[in-house]
Regions:
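Conserved GTPase G-domain signal focused on the G5
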Residues: 14, 228-246
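Nucleotide-state-sensitive switch-loop elements of NTP-binding domains
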Residues: 2-8, 13, 17-119, 126-130
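Beta-strand-loop-alpha "switch" segments that mediate conformational coupling across diverse proteins
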Residues: 216-228
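Eukaryotic short linear interaction motifs
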Residues: 14, 42-44, 140-142, 173-175, ...
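C-terminal helical "lid" subdomain and adjoining coupling/linker elements of P-loop NTPases
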Residues: 248-257
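Conserved beta-strand segments of the P-loop GTPase G domain that flank and frequently precede/overlap
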Residues: 7-8, 37, 101-104, 131-138, ...
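Structural and coupling elements of P-loop NTPases
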Residues: 162-165, 225, 232, 254
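Conserved catalytic-core segment of NTP-binding enzymes
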Residues: 109-209, 215
Length: 259
């Protein structure tokens, strides 16, 4: 395995669609790519996983065995994934020259905020790991929505301490003007502050000024990667960041020859 990209983010942001579309784009560009589903509760996936945790973990069995409801069984299932880390590494053994896309559970807390999640990443891919935080483009057009998603992005980074991309998904649902405005907020916290004050008024001013200052000081205000999983717009930029981290910017074929 060249490296693993863990796709994380809140429910409804299009993580699985992004994962499947990126996997297909990499294959179309003639890169070796595989996709792993780590969501034991997924009823439907918009792709055919190469490794599927649902073959080992059944929510119905957990509910029956432990007398749990749907929510409790999801939590138990999320913690059980680490027990099958060896199965995942065994699957990866023959994928020396592959980029691996890891689609994580739909609800962000089931992966990011469980103690087992960092152990999974360490066992499966170690330092050959990076994160793609998937943000919802329509929500991000509101200053408050953008700030909230940046806070979640910071939370994910603080859990894993791996290279991370802020991926603005579903840009096909917003205008080009909206995307450019979000990019301006990213490059200038002052503009974001002004936009937030216009949206919310003065009531929360001191609180959010403090948050924006923290963003600036900790470099949380990082580059945005706008993408559309519908037409693969922006995927070349995602691949470029993966190649930059995993292979020093060399394409897969060059990496194979030298590595």
């Amino acid at each position: 395995m060249i490296g693993a990209l863990y796709v994380v983010g809140p429910a409804g942001t299009g993580k699985s669609t992004f994962s499947g579309s990126l996997n297909e784009w990499l294959k179309h560009m003639e890169f070796d790519s595989a996709i792993i589903n780590l969501d034991p509760g997924a009823d439907y996936l918009p792709y055919e996983p190469d490794f599927d945790i649902r073959e080992y973990i059944s929510l119905d069995s957990i509910m029956s065995d432990y007398n749990l409801g749907p929510n409790g069984s999801q939590i138990v299932a999320a913690d059980m994934i680490v027990s099958y880390a060896d199965k995942i590494t065994e699957f990866l053994e023959d994928l020396d020259d592959y980029y691996v896309i890891v689609d994580t559970p739909g609800q962000i807390e089931l992966f990011t905020f469980r103690t087992s999640s960092t152990e999974i990443v360490e066992k499966v891919s170690g330092q050959r790991s990076m994160m793609a935080y998937i943000a919802d483009a329509p929500l991000s057009t509101y200053p408050s929505g953008f700030i909230a998603q940046k806070m979640l992005y910071a939370s994910v980074f603080s859990r894993f301490f791996r290279p991370m991309m802020f991926v603005l998904n579903k840009i096909d649902l917003v205008s080009d003007e909206d995307i450019q405005e979000v990019k301006k907020w990213e490059s200038s916290p002052d503009l974001l502050n002004d936009a937030f004050m216009e949206e919310k008024g003065q009531m929360e001013k001191d609180y959010f000024i403090g948050i924006l200052e923290a963003f600036k000081e900790s470099n949380i205000m990082t580059k945005i990667y706008p993408v559309s999983s519908k037409d693969s717009f922006g995927f070349e930029d995602i691949y470029s960041q993966m190649a930059l981290y995993f292979t020093g910017g060399e394409d897969n074929d060059t990496y194979r020859e030298e590595g």
